[in-house]
Amino acid sequence: MTDDEPTSEEPTSEGPTDQEPAKEKPFRRRQRYRGTHPRNFNEKYKELSASPDPETIAKLIDSGKTPAGQHRPILVTETLEFLAPQPGERGADVTLGHGGHSERLLTGLQPGGQLLALDVDALQLPLTEERLRGLGFGTKTLTIRRCNFAGLAGMLPQIGWHDGVDFVLADLGLSSMQIDNPARGFSYKYDGPLDMRMNPERGLSARDWLKRCRFEKLVRVLIDGSDEPLAEQIAAVLVEVSSRGPINTTGQLRLAIESALPEDITEAGRRSTLARVFQAIRIAVNEEFSALDTFLRCLPGCLLPGGRVAILSFHSGEDRRVKHHFRDGFRSGVYREIAPDIIRPTGQEIRANSRAASAKMRWAIRS
């Protein structure tokens, strides 16, 4: 029997029933540091792996912040409203992350539906799989593969779904677990090794990438990846600093960027610049634009007639690509309908989760 043939053993009622849910773990406070200073990054940020204090978590959420090490999916209501997963359908979440969207999609697909979930992150993927399996979503309902979203077209025939899927979701943003883990090197807010790779087992780290990057290329990266207005000034400083020795940590990169900023820059301007530069370098290190272009080029062939696709982007470089792909596909007849405009989070969602502020969603329906 192939993976694409539902069996009588699959759930016959709404909700996950493949296996018994895991028991909830009791709350455990993190241990205090020994001595006066932490000895390594993992010890410095132990709270990221400790069991959360429910009272503290509630206070942070009420204030509009995302607790460290936890992820709050964005535009869930709008995404589910458009994709509208139905019992018995097949869908694909090509950027699984923490699985917040997948969890809701899976519920809508029951009984008899199936979801393919992809993610390239070798560190986050097993944690998310454990969480979703613990909720009762077994292998007959949820297929998880370690794969970049650009590989969707090649993955579908591998699992026997040769004709495509009823819907596709792509959330192009980082998960909070990636951002808040200092060992990953994604954020200027945490001091950690300057890595930034989605897949730590492949390619150059941000440290090594910066060491090899020339001025002209770095300027293009900062402009294309974040529309950075101070691209030339910042690129000149980073190239000069890297020539004296590698930039090993996020803290060192932050200081180098700050040294290129004008003295009269506001605190908000400083933070925005740091976020943009880190974002642009991350995009380049992971070749994210190239992966998105490949995904969009192959996307129509992955959708059944009438298939729906929703894509969440978080900066102009991504959104431009998605917008142009949907527009050109609509004009050529590939898509029968596209979103007339971007869909943004409500003010209420942004107040509850500040990381949602830059999110944009676009959708299309296959002809």
Q: What label would you give each PLM region?
A:
Residues 1-367:
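S-adenosyl-L-methionine-dependent methyltransferase catalytic core, i.e., the SAM/SAH-binding region
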